[in-house]
């Protein structure tokens, strides 16, 4: 019980972000090729050594390293990095100074490497790719590659990103998650169906175990296939899931699936399908391995849509990793977790299975709260920050109410439930009060009442016109020049941490928007990897976002006043004043 409520608490606190840490203006950053100098060498042992020389003040993300073209069993083991905390992307593992990776001698052919790095001063370079020949030939071509991240609605919900070195922990987490899903309303009807096919047929214990294993393995293999597909889709799946209508649809689905957890209605497998499966199980005397396997595969396909919400969380996380091997193993582990109670049922009988009771209602409540939290989390990119914080406050009050109501079954944990209820009630109340005052900081909800301007990132977002192609940019520049208007070009990407920080700390400040009221604000979105995005970057030789360029009324850039990297509101306003006076 203690762990369950600790999990709920962590669900909220992982969304909180730290205070701002603005940097001085640093107009000159190294080109990406000098910040991260890559070399490859064929060793006498037959291995291929890959090395990145990383300049001081720069770092590479571990999770952005890709080795496309290397067989799953030959993927390299990445060395331990150092922890790095991003305000929006959470805890990350990064490499500084240098990174050495060795590909085994058995690897052959051309490999497409991918990586992404940033500067401590705030600049985030676009994702890079490089093709190398494992025979030792030099790298031949480099280009940007599409990579999107947690920010979006992202949609990662199961846990903090698990690094490559923590596969064991990740697989264990998916197995445990599957064990919980085994007692979801959609899964429970499969218990008597399989029992009727195995136990009711009079099969021996050994035969019953074989039949049940066939059922569970085939079910897990179907889930594994889902995981592999999600990993192969990778960034394409994430990019598709960033669309507002998709985020809204999934959020609505999570809310809908939370309602039966609180007893509003009952969600279960359609009676027609359940009856047909039961009939098929009765017709098979003694059962067969193939029959049980087919039944297991069908159950995964039939029950899967009924469990769309939790499955979506797992699939989204797997899509982030982009690793098909891990995706398949993770969903296979989840399927085994779902099937474990079935194996216990047919081998040990129902004596060792959990008995229905108040704990089931508690488990359903936990699922309901997690589903609601998932819905709120997914809507982050499309909601007013104040409204988003208010929704978290309302959910915290729901948690407090549920914890207070469950004190009757808490037993010796009565005081823990009571303290947890009071804690969530206090936090939820502060979130609502802060949201009502225009605040948007989950970690410090009442700071809005301390005085000083309050960021309004929605107003900032509305003030910008999003540009995604060179044609759109040229049209906007021509229009501004015809009107004798200044233009601010803001290079932005969803995977850019500093962009999201500046959205709030710079462009969300009233004094900044007031100073820019006569300036045409263009946001150049270079999130995706396509020809348009690369041309937008190359037109002004921009290394990556965040970068801000001033275009004068004559249509030419004020190059000496360019801002590259993260700055605070005061530094930004000072640069704008200098630009305006220097014309």
UniProtKB/Swiss-Prot annotation:
The chain crosses the membrane at residues 168-188, 214-234, 245-265, 289-309, 326-346, 359-379, 382-402, 413-433. Its main location: membrane. Residues 1-18 form the signal peptide. It is a multi-pass membrane protein. InterPro entries: Cyt_c_assmbl_TM_dom (IPR003834), DsbD_gamma (IPR035671), DsbDN (IPR028250), DsbDN_sf (IPR036929), Thiol_diS_interchange_DbsD (IPR022910), Thioredoxin-like_sf (IPR036249), Thioredoxin_CS (IPR017937), Thioredoxin_domain (IPR013766). It is an enzyme of class 1 (oxidoreductase). Its EC number is 1.8.1.8. It is found in: Cell inner membrane. Pfam families: DsbD_N, DsbD_TM, Thioredoxin_7. GO terms for biological process: cell redox homeostasis; cytochrome complex assembly. Coiled coil: none annotated. SUPFAM superfamilies: Thiol:disulfide interchange protein DsbD, N-terminal domain (DsbD-alpha) (SSF74863), Thioredoxin-like (SSF52833). GO terms for cellular component: plasma membrane. It catalyses: [protein]-dithiol + NAD(+) = [protein]-disulfide + NADH + H(+); [protein]-dithiol + NADP(+) = [protein]-disulfide + NADPH + H(+). One of its GO terms (molecular function) is protein-disulfide reductase [NAD(P)H] activity. Keywords: Cell inner membrane, Cell membrane, Cytochrome c-type biogenesis, Disulfide bond, Electron transport, Membrane, NAD, Oxidoreductase, Redox-active center, Signal, Transmembrane, Transmembrane helix, Transport. Disulfide bonds join 118-124, 186-306, 496-499. Residues 458-581 form the Thioredoxin domain. The keyword Mitochondrion does not apply. Required to facilitate the formation of correct disulfide bonds in some periplasmic proteins and for the assembly of the periplasmic c-type cytochromes. Acts by transferring electrons from cytoplasmic thioredoxin to the periplasm. This transfer involves a cascade of disulfide bond formation and reduction steps. Belongs to the thioredoxin family. DsbD subfamily. This is Thiol:disulfide interchange protein DsbD.
């Amino acid at each position: 019980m203690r762990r369950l409520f600790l999990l709920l608490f962590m669900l909220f606190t992982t969304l909180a972000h730290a205070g701002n840490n603005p940097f001085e203006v640093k107009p000159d950053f190294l080109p990406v090729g000098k910040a991260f100098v890559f070399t490859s060498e064929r060793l006498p042992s037959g291995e291929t050594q890959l090395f990145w020389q990383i300049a001081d003040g720069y770092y590479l993300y571990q999770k952005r390293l890709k080795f496309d073209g290397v067989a799953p069993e030959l993927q390299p083991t990445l060395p331990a990095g150092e922890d790095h905390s991003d305000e929006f992307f959470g805890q990350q593992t990064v490499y500084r100074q240098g990174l050495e990776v060795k590909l085994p001698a058995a690897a052959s052919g051309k490999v497409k490497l991918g990586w992404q790095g940033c500067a401590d001063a705030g600049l985030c370079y676009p994702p890079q790719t490089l093709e190398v020949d494992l025979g030792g030939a030099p790298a031949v071509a480099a280009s940007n590659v599409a990579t999107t991240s947690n920010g979006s609605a992202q949609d990662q919900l199961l846990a903090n990103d698990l690094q490559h070195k923590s596969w064991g922990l990740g697989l264990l987490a998916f197995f445990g998650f599957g064990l919980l899903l085994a007692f979801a309303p959609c899964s429970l009807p499969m218990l008597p169906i399989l029992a009727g096919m195995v136990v009711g047929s009079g099969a021996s214990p050994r035969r019953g175990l074989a039949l049940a294993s066939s059922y569970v393995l085939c079910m897990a293999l179907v889930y594994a296939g889902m995981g592999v597909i999600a990993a192969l889709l990778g960034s394409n799946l994430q990019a598709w899931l960033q669309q507002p209508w998709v985020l809204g649809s999934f959020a609505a689905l999570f809310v809908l699936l939370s309602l039966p957890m609180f007893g509003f209605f009952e969600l279960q497998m359609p009676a027609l399908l359940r009856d047909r499966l039961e009939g098929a199980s009765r017709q098979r005397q003694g059962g067969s391995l193939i029959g049980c396997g087919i039944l297991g595969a069908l159950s995964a396909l039939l029950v899967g849509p009924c469990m769309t919400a939790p499955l979506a969380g797992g699939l989204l996380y797997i899509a982030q990793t982009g690793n098909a091997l891990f995706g398949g193993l993770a969903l296979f582990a989840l399927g085994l977790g779902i099937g474990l109670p079935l194996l216990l049922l047919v081998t040990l009988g129902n004596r060792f299975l959990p008995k229905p009771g108040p704990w089931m209602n508690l488990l359903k409540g936990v699922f309901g709260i997690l589903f609601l939290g998932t819905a709120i989390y997914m809507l982050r990119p499309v909601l007013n920050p104040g409204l988003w914080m208010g929704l978290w406050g309302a959910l915290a009050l729901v948690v407090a109410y549920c914890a207070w109501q469950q004190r009757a079954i808490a037993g010796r944990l009565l005081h823990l439930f009571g303290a947890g209820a009071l804690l969530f009630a206090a936090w939820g109340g502060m979130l609502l009060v802060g949201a009502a005052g225009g605040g948007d900081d989950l970690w410090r909800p009442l700071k809005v009442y301390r005085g000083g301007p309050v960021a309004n990132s929605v107003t900032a977002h509305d003030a910008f016109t999003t540009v995604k192609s060179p044609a759109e940019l040229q049209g906007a520049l021509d229009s501004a020049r015809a009107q004798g208007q200044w233009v601010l070009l803001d290079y932005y990407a969803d995977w850019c941490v500093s962009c999201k920080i500046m959205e709030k700390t710079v462009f969300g400040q009233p004094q900044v928007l007031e100073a820019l009221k006569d300036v045409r604000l263009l946001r150049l979105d270079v999130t995706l990897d396509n020809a348009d995005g690369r041309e937008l970057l190359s037109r002004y030789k921009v290394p990556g976002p965040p970068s801000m360029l001033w275009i004068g009324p004559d249509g030419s850039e004020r190059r000496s006043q360019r801002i590259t990297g993260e700055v605070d509101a005061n530094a930004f306003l000072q640069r704008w004043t200098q630009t305006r006076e220097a014309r």
